[in-house]
Amino acid sequence: MKKPLLVSFLLLTLILGACGGGSLEGEEVTITGALIGTDQDGFRAAFEPFTEETGIIVSYQGSDNFEQEIQIQMESGDTPDFALWPQPGAVVDAANRGYLTPLADLDIDLDQYQNDFSSYLVGLGTVDGVIYGGANAANLKSIVWYQP
């Protein structure tokens, strides 16, 4: 049986915040992604105040083979709670294959989310009108300047 995976590429703290509260103290949330090295260290450190406030333990595991590993995990049904994909196209594929949990299935105010973020960022985590996640970072790989 497939375990649905929640993708989150800025929504992570919003979603975890919605899960906050004493009733979840001691619970662990697992996250995997492609952040490694100092990026991984910084990402882990960013959740320390959240853990102190809520008691929810956030466990992040980064890998330079994330894309291959997450495919194997999805196919086996042994997925983390959250995944940070570096490519939006991979999110589309995972959603189309039924591996992702729509944010509407969680206690997330999607109207507020869409008001708070640009339509472009919302679109990165949307597949066929269903929102599965959102961008926590963007990289500019190239740019073309034109001045007439």
What are these regions (language model features)?
Residues 1-30, 52:
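Short, low-complexity disordered leader/linker segments with a strong preference
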Residues 26-37, 56-61, 81-82, 132:
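Short, well-ordered beta-strand elements
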Residues 37-57:
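Short, polar/charged alpha-helical segment
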Residues 62-69, 88:
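Short helix-initiation/N-cap motifs at beta->coil->alpha
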Residues 68-79, 97:
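Short helices/loops that flank or line small-molecule/ion binding pockets
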Residues 82-83, 143:
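A residue-level structural signature of the nucleotidyltransferase/glycosyltransferase Rossmann-like core
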Residues 88-144:
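Hinge/lid segment of periplasmic solute-binding proteins
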Residues 147-148:
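N-terminal capping loop/helix in small sensory signaling domains highlighted by a polar->aromatic N-x2-3-F motif
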